[in-house]
Amino acid sequence: MQANRTLSLRPATLADAALIASIHAASWQATYRGLLPDVFLDGEVTHERAAYWEARLSAPGGERRIVRIAELDGEPIGFVCAERQPESAWGVLLDNLHALPGYQGIGVGKLLMRAAEDWTRAQGEAQLYLYVLEGNTPAIGFYERQGWQFVGAEPDHMGGRDITALRYVYRLEK
């Protein structure tokens, strides 16, 4: 990243649902090619993510989650969503961490992750967990370099295909 460029975060609002959905879909289209069916990635993923984020951001319980948008010089390039899961023994769910493909490797993922960590600490929680699609080697490598630990795998269904979701945890330092 050029030294004079500014990477910043801002809270997401309901008005950002379509924007978040477009980043989410673009990330999946680039990352999940070969892991999920092309017909899903090239077709319904855009509409599916738009409906998902519209519903999620308008649903009650917003105090249980943080959604932040990363911007580079005011241009949205990524987002993070973390949510308290009171019934979970695993802690706070880092549910989404996505950067547009052209902006990966410039520190946006780390910035978004730190925002989720800070929010988790402020909630009095000591651990985050996430699921990553088996075969998503770049994301797995990123999480492991950040100190996340693999703790298990679960069957799931995504994009019309049975998949394996790998669970990782990250214990926050005090």
Predicted segments with their positions:
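Acetyl-CoA-dependent GNAT
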Residues: 2-7, 11-14, 25-102, 110-119, ...
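Acidic/polar helix N-cap motif
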Residues: 13-16, 136
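Charged catalytic carboxylate motif
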Residues: 19, 111-112, 138
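Hydrophobic pocket/interface hotspot
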Residues: 20, 24
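Residues that form or flank phosphate/diphosphate-binding pockets in enzymes
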Residues: 89, 107, 138
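C-terminal "cap" of GNAT-fold acetyltransferases
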Residues: 92, 126-141, 145-174
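Active-site acidic-Proline motif in GNAT/NAT acetyltransferases
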Residues: 100-102, 106, 134-135
